[in-house]
């Protein structure tokens, strides 16, 4: 197992939590996100936790950005062992109010950027005898929600890509896993990062998802985790 990882969408939320977990475990990681200031803050946190970190600020929806991010990670780390496709966004509107721009933005980042990043890194994984891809989806990749038809459909699409990539890349020892978390206390969900103590009684925090991702990244050579669905514990 190569303890190096490329993590997208790492400037806050689940991506930040994943970066923290890998840093705590002593990995060398490359963090990618659009907001450079936030990204550098996360990098500092990771270093304080014991990880080695590189930062690449870019908008992954731009044509050349996914390939450039992969190239940067390879140049800095020499060999990438794990890709965590976490970058994503959501807009929540009733169907009569959906704008074309909203549809395009969500599919461009949540689907196209993930595909383009995998497309760029797959030859590197193949050359090095294998690798691990973790695609961060959502519980809404299994169901539909009111006002979330576009966001939900991007996560269904990502699951479809995940299934196809598993078939395509299996013979090259490249493992692919979809992680679909339920409600997590992040700014994406309109919450203060990590939530309040009261909120933590009923919802997940980024570290919960990070733990699952790390389990996938460190699985044994003879196991292949296909999919993880993480739901909030029902205490009723």
Question: Which residues does each predicted region cover?
Answer:
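C-terminal helical subdomain
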Residues: 178-179, 196-236
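Conserved glycine-rich Rossmann-like NAD(P)H-binding loop of the short-chain dehydrogenase/reductase
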Residues: 25-41
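Substrate-binding pocket helix/loop in short-chain dehydrogenase/reductase
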Residues: 94-95, 99-104
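Active-site helix of classical SDR
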Residues: 118, 154
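Residue(s) in the substrate-gating loop at a strand-loop-helix junction
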Residues: 138
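The beta1-alpha1 cofactor-binding region of Rossmann-like NAD(H)/NADP(H)-dependent oxidoreductases
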Residues: 37, 57-68, 100
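Conserved glycine-rich cofactor-binding loop
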Residues: 11-13
């Amino acid at each position: 197992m190569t303890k190096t990882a490329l993590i997208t969408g790492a400037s806050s939320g689940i991506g930040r939590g994943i970066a923290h977990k890998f840093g705590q475990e002593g990995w060398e990681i490359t963090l990618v996100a659009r907001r450079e200031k936030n990204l550098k803050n996360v990098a500092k946190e990771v270093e304080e936790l014991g990880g080695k970190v590189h930062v690449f600020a870019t908008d992954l929806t731009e044509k050349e950005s996914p390939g450039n991010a992969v190239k940067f990670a390879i140049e800095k780390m020499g060999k990438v062992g794990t890709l965590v496709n976490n970058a994503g966004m959501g807009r929540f509107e009733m169907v009569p109010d959906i704008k074309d721009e909203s549809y395009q933005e969500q599919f461009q980042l949540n689907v196209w950027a993930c595909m383009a990043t995998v497309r760029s890194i797959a030859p590197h994984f193949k050359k090095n005898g294998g690798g691990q891809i973790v695609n961060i989806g959502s519980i809404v990749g299994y169901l539909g929600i009111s006002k979330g038809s576009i966001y939900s459909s991007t996560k269904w699409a990502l699951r479809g890509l995940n299934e196809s990539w598993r078939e395509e890349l299996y013979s090259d020892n490249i493992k692919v896993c979809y992680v679909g978390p339920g409600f997590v206390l992040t700014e994406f969900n309109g919450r203060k990062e990590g939530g309040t103590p009261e909120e933590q009684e009923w919802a997940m925090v980024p570290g919960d998802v990070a733990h699952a991702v790390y389990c996938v990244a460190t699985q044994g050579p003879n196991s292949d985790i296909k999919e993880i669905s993480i739901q909030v514990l029902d205490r009723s």
